[in-house]
Structures are given as structure tokens and as C-alpha cells.
């Protein structure tokens, strides 16, 4: 079996989670340049290999979207409550954030929504820059679900950016932290 077949088999087996680049390089015993070339030269009738952050996933081609949508029209893989969607958007656009930051923004306890997002693999808690509290960030699965390659691909407008900057500047001042 050639490397294209092996790569396809690995990504198919990994499913929606995909495989991290480091894993692929180790299993296939090749350099990053060789992997990139292999992916660029990959061709299949209905499938393609996409990169979401550092994860590679075997996906269907866009041309098949309408047929696939018809197949799964009645099923929703990732149902989220309104609260979970609000929290997810707050994290996505302002990460990293602590749970208390989210509660300050929403003025309501958001632990349930955060736990749901973590359980679904869309968000993870990490210690960032040696801060005392865990910081919430989106995952590669989030990128995959929303069909973007990196967080900078999220839709935004200049006006929204200015409003968010002003809001977070005010939030930092309310918490008594330095703006520097």
C-alpha cells in the first residue's frame, strides 16, 4: 500500500477527531515537508484532507455538501443551548478567558454551559502564562465544527473589534488590573 492509502486509512480510522500532525509524522516516519506534499497530491473522488489547527482530518469535498445535508438533515450532531452558544462565542472571540471573566460578561453563572462545551470537546481549560486560574480556549474540534483553519478566520467587523476592545478595557479596569 502506498503512503496515500496509509494516510487515508489512518485519517478514516481517526474519524472526526482527526490526527495531530506530530502523530502522523511519527506513524508515517516522514518529514513535515513530505507530509505536506503527500496531502497536496492526495486526490479521491469524494474526499479530501483538511487541516484544522495542527490536526488533519479526512473530509468530504464541498461538491458533495448538498447531498450530505440531505442525508443528515434530520440529525443534529452538535446541539447546544442558547447559553452554551453564548459562552462559546465569548470564549472564541476573547480567548483565553477564565470562568469568572465569562460570568462578568454574562452576569450569570455559566458553569453548566462551560461544562457542556468541555464535554463536547469544543473548549478546554489550560493554565496560560502562569495565571492562577485556568483559562478557557477553543480546541481543534471547534475549528473543525465551524469549518475554519484557525481562530483568526472567525467572522468579525471593525466596529465589533472596537466595541470588544472598549468592553474588555472597561472589564480590566473594573477588576482593578493594570491595562499595560
From Swiss-Prot:
InterPro entries named in the record: ScpB_csome_segregation, WH-like_DNA-bd_sf, WH_DNA-bd_sf
Keywords, alphabetical: Cell cycle, Cell division, Chromosome partition, Cytoplasm
Signal peptide (UniProt feature, chain positions): none
Entry's localization field: Cytoplasm
Pfam families, A to Z: SMC_ScpB (PF04079)
Predominant subcellular localization, coarse grouping: cytoplasm
One GO location term (cellular component): cytoplasm
UniProt record, GO biological process: cell division; chromosome separation; DNA replication
Disulphide-bridged cysteine pairs: none
Biological function: Participates in chromosomal partition during cell division. May act via the formation of a condensin-like complex containing Smc and ScpA that pull DNA away from mid-cell into both cell halves.
Protein family membership: Belongs to the ScpB family.
Oligomer status and interactors: Homodimer. Homodimerization may be required to stabilize the binding of ScpA to the Smc head domains. Component of a cohesin-like complex composed of ScpA, ScpB and the Smc homodimer, in which ScpA and ScpB bind to the head domain of Smc. The presence of the three proteins is required for the association of the complex with DNA.
HAMAP family referenced in this protein's UniProt entry, alphabetically: ScpB
NCBIfam families: SMC-Scp complex subunit ScpB
Protein's UniProt name: Segregation and condensation protein B
Species name: Staphylococcus aureus (strain JH9)
Name of the gene this protein is made from: scpB
